[in-house]
Amino acid sequence: MPWKNTTMEFGAIAKLFHWTGAAAFIAAYAVVYYVIWFMDDTSPDALPVLNVHWVLGMIVGLSVLPRLLWRLVNVQPDQPHASHAEAWLAHAAHWGLYVLLILMPLTGYIGTDAATDFGAFALPNFRETALFGWIETRWGISWEAFEPPVDAIHHVVGKGIAWIVVALHVAAALFHHVVRRDGVLTRMLPGRSVA
């Protein structure tokens, strides 16, 4: 399998970004729903488990920039037999996914009042950063006023919009695979190559 994209398929790097991001995104959801369903999220016992959610979210968020750069410098596989409207919709849907992959980790980090511990180092909570200090000084907004709307965005998007966007992405991939039989799904599967 080539490491760069071709007009026929995604390369190994694009597939690695896709499946690593998907796995981290799904795992972050599994972890946070474990906390919601089986733990008291205000308990100190929940903090190490929530930290796993935060680390996974950071993996998703920090991988978006190199993923976008890789997408911009590589050719994208051709859209098979798509109308202008379908091609536009596919393009808009992919950029919508990128917005989601940025928005969820960003609002999650900003709205968390605890450090994210990666083991070898810890990322301070947003409240302790120079950026928030500047926001607080510049606009005179306290953490107590700043954090709740950001946290609300994270929860609304996470509990509703993200599920819809991901479900539409999976449904579109399955539509291409089952109905169209055009190879759109298989060209993103790991280990597959048209060559």
Task: Write out the residue ranges for each language-model feature.
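Membrane-embedded alpha-helical bundles that constitute the cytochrome b-like, heme-associated redox core
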Residues: 1-195
